[in-house]
Amino acid sequence: MDVFKQSEVWFVIGSQNLYGPKTLQQVMDNAHHVVNSLNSEAGLPVKLVLKPLVTTPDEITALCREANYDTACIGVMTWLHTFSPAKMWIGGLSILHKPLLQFHTQFNAQIPWETMDMDFMNLNQTAHGGREFGFIGARMRQQHSVITGHWQDKEAHQRISQWMRVAAAKQENQQLKVARFGDNMREVAVTEGDKVAAQIQFGYSVNAYGIGDLVTVVDAVSKGEIDALVEEYEATYRLTDAVQLHGNKRENLLDAARIELGMKRFLEQGGFKAFTTNFENLYGLKQLPGLAVQRLMQQGYGFGGEGDWKTAALLRILKVMGTGLKGGTSFMEDYTYNFQPGNDLVVGSHMLEVCPSIAKEEKPLLDVQHLGIGGKADPARLIFSTPAGPALNASLIDMGNRFRLLVNVVDTVEQPHPLPKLPVARAIWQAQPSLATAAEAWIIAGGAHHTVFSQAIGVDELRLYAEMHGIEFLLIDNDTTLPAFKNEIRWNEVYYHLNR
């Protein structure tokens, strides 16, 4: 999955005509140098495209209008090389719908102490030109990001890359379609929510389909297609005796392959990039989709169990953000605790549906075992553990008057003991700042039992994602204390009530 190849970020230089053609030409020459260097040396995930210099309100407005309607453009990055009076930007910024990044940089890294004259000062005015631009953004109450640093600085490169990934995720939101196979798990609260409000806030659409619609496609899968996919299984995974040729669960594996092929075909035909299932709505399917869901997540699809469309959409978005990065991202659920002084642990898992992108093993184990929930035949699943390292759990919840993105930073650990009787994939982590504080803060904030677990994406990207969409962001990490966390929630209640 590479969602970045067809995308671009427009690099825009603002100035004014009073500087004269010689200075403006030097500005553009410097801009060409900066853009070419960033594209070739900074490791950015999205290509920068230098646009013509803008020096008048009409030019700025025309450029912003063009950016809105260019599907390849996922955002606009500005550099105020000289001074660009910000009233010129009001018309353009008032109609700009794409993410905006102000790169507060200058061409020279250091001051040329012995040679600096007024011509140099006239040309290099980022220090105050950027402040003028920043004022109009603040005055218009417009969300825009600011990155300060020299254009050759590695930290600046990293932050620009993060912004690009989040901008691409926002673009994905605008075209994302989520399919719900069946409805919500009966009587469950947190997986419900306002789908119309979500489409207004984020852009993605959520629609339900009867399980019979899926079954029709599943039943149409040919034997040849199934055999070919099972050969892929045999080459990719370690198969238990039960699912190998002539094994007593081989037929269950063939059924799982049929479900995967049918489910993927349904999603492709409808243009869906995220989906949900529900073990209470399985009529016509021989088993709960487990292996199918795991493999589709690894291919970049978002997923949520029990009809959880918010988690499905969020998972797809984090998959997009994390394209090409080390580490995986998966649907997850806090399942059980290990209460032990100095070694409190959380076991995260689900009935079946954990993405192999977070697998420690090069070849996960493929098996079929009994599942007491759902009342169907024993389902196929991949079984694996997760490597140690930094990670996070993210939950998107509907608070009625706003959406809340809740994030807990965790430290994934090596599985301390074998789990010979647990036939599901799992991750084990220590929650920051402690299990007690993290769990209490999560519960107080109304965090869902379903999360998106990621070892690829960090807090900065998710905070920026929340800012771009105007939603609440709450963080639980090593700096969290419960009194301060509760106060933040109280203050946010007032802010979002007044900001409706």
Swiss-Prot record:
PANTHER family recorded: L-ARABINOSE ISOMERASE
Q: Which UniProt keywords apply?
A: Arabinose catabolism, Carbohydrate metabolism, Isomerase, Manganese, Metal-binding
- What does UniProt list as this organism's lineage? Bacteria, Pseudomonadati, Pseudomonadota, Gammaproteobacteria, Enterobacterales
Q: Does the keyword Manganese apply?
A: yes
Enumerate the Gene3D superfamilies for this protein.
3.40.50.10940
* GO process annotations (BP): L-arabinose catabolic process to xylulose 5-phosphate
The cofactor note from the UniProt entry for this protein is: Binds 1 Mn(2+) ion per subunit.
Name the domain of life.
Bacteria
Job description of the protein: Catalyzes the conversion of L-arabinose to L-ribulose.
Q: What is this protein called?
A: L-arabinose isomerase
Q: Name one GO molecular function term.
A: manganese ion binding
Task: Quote the EC number.
Answer: 5.3.1.4
Binding site residues for Mn(2+): E306, E333, H350, H450
> What reaction is this protein's catalytic activity?
beta-L-arabinopyranose = L-ribulose
Q: Which family does it belong to?
A: Belongs to the arabinose isomerase family.
Q: Under which pathway is this protein filed?
A: Carbohydrate degradation; L-arabinose degradation via L-ribulose; D-xylulose 5-phosphate from L-arabinose (bacterial route): step 1/3
